[in-house]
């Protein structure tokens, strides 16, 4: 777990009325080394909102998991499955970490990436389609109010996740440069790559060797097992191969050396 960290921030309810439907909280906001300000947020409400952005795909993934593990759908907790939206966000954060490894102070914070990605997501069923849709659409959800750039908290209008951009405009500039680089690395360059080896090399430049090697090795193993078990599908002429059936997909027949 040395690659992960957890931020812990003390907070209290926003009001003294402890009602179960009131989930707003009051927290401290660091202005500088010795000054703090009151701010408000609603992480529980945010989580519920995030789940609504992928509710149909989340339900589908839970049904698949339940069937494969012989469980009732109600018994499948959300954390046991991952949607294309969640995986796309993971990839964007990894790309962010590599891109800003020598400029960490200007890296976009995770809540900005997560919020814009969730707003731009349109229910795509594959990770690649999701990340293309997100990268091509997330900028339109950045508002400019009286000259101030705003990434609004969807469950608390007064909270601007990009408030530091006003104080540190170089962070805003860095964000837009990163978006353009991510579009190149995830969309333009892969489309021009010839062969899996070339594709893997392209991804290693922006995501690192280890995760790309793991992903491509697992992909090869999954494709082999899926074809052997009759669960490999082809989508159209250019849609590629996948291990889950979807609309328009054709089952790939098993391969033998004797033509049967």
Region locations from a protein language model:
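Short, Lys/Arg-enriched charge-dense amphipathic segments
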Residues: 4-21, 122-135, 170-181, 214-226, ...
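Residue-identity detector for threonine
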Residues: 15, 23, 28, 52, ...
């Amino acid at each position: 777990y040395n690659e992960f960290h957890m931020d812990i921030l003390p907070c209290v309810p926003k009001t003294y009325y402890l009602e179960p439907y009131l989930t707003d909280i009051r927290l401290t906001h660091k202005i500088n080394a010795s000054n703090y300000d009151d701010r408000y947020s609603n992480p529980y409400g945010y989580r519920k909102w995030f789940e609504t952005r992928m509710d149909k795909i989340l339900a589908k993934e839970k049904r698949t998991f339940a069937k494969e593990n012989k469980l009732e759908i109600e018994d499948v907790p959300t954390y046991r499955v991952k949607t294309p939206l969640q995986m796309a966000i993971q990839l964007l954060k990894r790309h962010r970490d590599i891109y800003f490894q020598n400029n960490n102070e200007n890296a976009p914070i995770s809540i900005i990436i997560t919020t814009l990605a969730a707003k731009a997501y349109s229910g795509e069923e594959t990770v690649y389609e999701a990340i293309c849709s997100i990268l091509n659409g997330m900028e339109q959800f950045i508002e400019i109010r009286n000259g101030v750039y705003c990434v609004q908290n969807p469950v608390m209008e007064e909270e601007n996740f990009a408030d530091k951009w006003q104080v540190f405009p170089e962070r805003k500039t860095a964000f837009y440069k990163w978006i353009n680089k991510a579009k190149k690395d995830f969309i333009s360059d892969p489309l021009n790559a010839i062969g899996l080896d070339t594709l893997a090399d392209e991804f290693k430049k922006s995501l690192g060797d280890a995760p790309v090697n793991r992903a491509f090795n697992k992909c090869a193993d999954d494709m082999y097992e899926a074809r052997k078990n009759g669960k490999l599908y082809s989508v159209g002429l250019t849609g590629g191969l996948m291990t889950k059936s979807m609309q328009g997909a054709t089952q790939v027949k098993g391969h033998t050396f004797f033509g049967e």
